[in-house]
Amino acid sequence: MRIEGVIVATVTPFTKDGVNYESLRTLLSKIVSEGYQGVFPTSSTGEVTKLTFEERVKVMEVAKEVAGGRALVVAGTGTGDHLSTIEIARRYKDVGVDALLITPPYYIQYDWAAIYAFYKRVLDKVDMPTILYTIPLATGYNIPVEVFELVANEYSQVVGVKDSSGDFRYHLDLIHLLGKRLSVLQGLDLLFVPSLLMGAQGGVLAGPNFLGRITLEQYRLVKEGKIAEAVALHNKLMPLWRFMGGCGLVGKLGGKWPTLYKVATQIVRGIDMGPPREPLPPIDDKDRRELEKLLKDLGLI
């Protein structure tokens, strides 16, 4: 499997009692119909660590049903140890997802050997197309490129690496050392065009939840060599990304970023997203007004 293009890390709609599967189905249907290459519901943006295992499986069942072979369905583990990762991965495999994205162990800052051992334990037990992942603002550490290289050399089911580090020099190392064998996928919307220009194969991004086909247009422009147009579109979006941030990397609101993506999706698409799941905070009226202005400036509302 060679993953190229845009995989959408979707938000998870909630009611006061649980996941709003009707709204989820509507959102996924719109994203797939817009032509995106894949969907990734159990993501950081989708509040995966706040979903029960049963909710995660049900979310992926809905995604698989909606995609219907028209888009890749990627499932994220969202777990911090190898036993839980193996358990949820096997359940995802039973659902029939197309690929697995493995969340690295978090809470403790692990060394190279521990990270490598974690991947070995999981991949020895789970044989399905797999995307490795680094997200240091959630784990407290960045995974050395050499660890990804070792794991990819040993396990043929590894097909890609998602990079949400925000460290562009590190990202260039991934492209240089792994890009010929694996799909290097940018995890931050604000770095998507620069990544494509330097040779990344695509992105796993949350912006398309509310941007419509804009992210696909960025991808198309780069692939067609229309670099000036791609850069102009990138720069047009920068005020939005500076406000919203991504993984807490930039943005005025820091840890509220998953809520912002959810609110933006409801404003633009008119789908009931409900509240974030605690302890994620809601945004206040001032933040909402600023978000609405930015969306209006882009012609989205």
Swiss-Prot record:
Major localisation: cytoplasm
Q: What Gene Ontology molecular-function terms does this entry list?
A: 2-dehydro-3-deoxy-phosphogluconate aldolase activity; 4-hydroxy-tetrahydrodipicolinate synthase activity
Q: What class of enzyme is it?
A: lyase
What are the UniProt keywords, alphabetically? Answer: Cytoplasm, Lyase, Schiff base
Active-site residues (renumbered): 44 (charge relay system), 107 (charge relay system), 133 (proton donor), 162 (schiff-base intermediate with substrate)
Q: Which InterPro entries match?
A: Aldolase_TIM (IPR013785), DapA-like (IPR002220)
Mention any Pfam family matching this sequence: DHDPS
Family matches, as SUPFAM superfamilies = Aldolase
Q: Does the keyword Cytoplasm apply?
A: yes
What is the E.C. number? 4.-.-.-
Which locations, inside or outside the cell, does it occupy?
A: Cytoplasm
A cellular component term from Gene Ontology for this protein is: cytoplasm
The UniProt record lists the keyword Lyase: yes
**Family that this chain belongs to:** Belongs to the DapA family.
On assembly, the entry states: Homotetramer.
| Name of the featured protein | Uncharacterized DapA-like lyase Pisl_0309
**Organism annotation:** Pyrobaculum islandicum (strain DSM 4184 / JCM 9189 / GEO3)
The gene coding this protein: dapAL
